[in-house]
UniProtKB/Swiss-Prot annotation:
InterPro entries, A to Z: Aldolase_TIM, ThiamineP_synth_sf, ThiamineP_synth_TenI, TMP_synthase
Amino-acid positions noted as binding Mg(2+) in the UniProt annotation, renumbered to this chain: 84, 103
Gene Ontology MF terms: magnesium ion binding; thiamine-phosphate diphosphorylase activity
Species whose genome carries this gene: Haemophilus influenzae (strain PittGG)
Name by which UniProt lists this protein: Thiamine-phosphate synthase
Gene Ontology cellular-component annotations: cytoplasm
Recorded catalytic activity of this chain's protein: 2-[(2R,5Z)-2-carboxy-4-methylthiazol-5(2H)-ylidene]ethyl phosphate + 4-amino-2-methyl-5-(diphosphooxymethyl)pyrimidine + 2 H(+) = thiamine phosphate + CO2 + diphosphate; 2-(2-carboxy-4-methylthiazol-5-yl)ethyl phosphate + 4-amino-2-methyl-5-(diphosphooxymethyl)pyrimidine + 2 H(+) = thiamine phosphate + CO2 + diphosphate; 4-methyl-5-(2-phosphooxyethyl)-thiazole + 4-amino-2-methyl-5-(diphosphooxymethyl)pyrimidine + H(+) = thiamine phosphate + diphosphate
Cofactor binding description: Binds 1 Mg(2+) ion per subunit.
GO biological process per UniProt: thiamine biosynthetic process; thiamine diphosphate biosynthetic process
Residues that coordinate or bind 4-amino-2-methyl-5-(diphosphooxymethyl)pyrimidine: 46-50, 83, 122, 152
Sites where the protein binds 2-[(2R,5Z)-2-carboxy-4-methylthiazol-5(2H)-ylidene]ethyl phosphate: 149-151, 181, 201-202
Amino acid sequence: MKNIQKILPLYFVAGTQDCRHLGENLSENLLFVLKQALEGGITCFQFRDKGKFSLEHTPSAQKALAINCRDLCREYGVPFIVDDNVDLALAIEADGIHVGQSDMPVQEIRAKTDKPLIIGWSVNRLDEAKIGENLAEIDYFGIGPIFPTQSKENPKPTLGMAFIQTLRNAGITKPLVAIGGVKLAHVKTLREFGADGVAVITAITHADNVQAATKALREASDEYAK
């Protein structure tokens, strides 16, 4: 599963904290949204369950939910990525892990398993991208936040869509997925600027019709596939 560009066109990121508006059963909320998003055509799912409104403080429930999400993704042949939690990712045999600049070094992650784990790395500055470009352990960059976002506590400075173009013009060749406040109207420009895909949270979790919104996002991204 190393043709990374193929899994990035529509990268869905979510946890229970993103679906709490749907009802009291946090796990059922996320599974409902994930199934609709899979039906709509997401190409990758990142389990990012963190914060005071998540299951982060009940690890057993969080692990059980992660396994259910993983199994659902496998029914649809969609890669299942875990955010930050390397131990969880390895324990449940996730397809990949996504880490930030201050998380476990990617060399350590790669050394923990012989399996072909997908590793994504968050990037907010050009110098970070230049460092990551030379790290063979990294499969793709998550670039953001592109726009202001409410989905992450204490987000880093926003970059704007043109930052994707800046990275490509600077010689960055690794696959890129743009994240942070991305909506349907932004997909065309982000793809034209050189993103291999878009990562969304609210554009799916808060859609009136999750499956239809997902389908529209996927079609917009595929239209500009390389």
